[in-house]
């Protein structure tokens, strides 16, 4: 892992800050994070985000695992939001028939753990906030930047030739 090697090479964030897009609390849980303090990560969720819903989720997770050191992470929060949206789509469709639930998903809204309300778009990507967090010595992140609101999920990059003209509308 890149963060471990940064520590091994004594590369500090003050020398060359690194932004990771796939390193979160779970990945940092097994390594010494003190040499990594100040490096950055970008996610839609960090365990350290201080909202009542997030505190409740973390407490339930730690109780379920019977391990106060187990961390939460962005993929877990995404599943919480996605499952809530699925439940609402089942209610709207009046059935668990997958085709009918898929048709019911666009426009469904559900609270996320960071304090906002996410929405399922017609392309089956959801709106989420974006955060940049700075690694702390305890393996958590301090949020140093966030989007003003929720960012719509895009299925294709407008910057990649061959995908810029594609449209994702699954329904």
Where are these regions (language model features)?
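Extracytosolic ligand-binding ectodomains
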Residues: 1-171
């Amino acid at each position: 892992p890149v963060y471990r090697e940064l520590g091994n090479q004594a590369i500090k964030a003050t020398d060359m800050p690194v932004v990771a897009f796939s390193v979160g609390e779970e990945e940092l849980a097994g390594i010494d994070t003190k040499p990594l303090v100040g490096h950055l990560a970008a996610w839609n969720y960090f365990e350290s985000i201080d909202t009542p819903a997030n505190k409740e989720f973390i407490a339930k997770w730690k109780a379920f695992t019977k391990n106060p050191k187990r961390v939460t992470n962005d993929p877990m929060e995404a599943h919480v939001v996605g499952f809530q949206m699925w439940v609402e789509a089942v209610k709207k469709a009046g059935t668990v028939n997958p085709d009918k639930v898929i048709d019911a998903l666009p426009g469904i809204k559900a609270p996320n753990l960071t304090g906002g309300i996410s929405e399922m778009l017609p392309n089956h990507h959801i709106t989420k906030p974006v955060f940049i967090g700075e690694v702390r010595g305890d393996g958590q992140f301090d949020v140093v930047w966030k989007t003003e609101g929720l960012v719509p999920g895009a299925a294709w990059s407008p910057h990649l030739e061959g995908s810029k003209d594609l449209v994702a509308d699954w329904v």
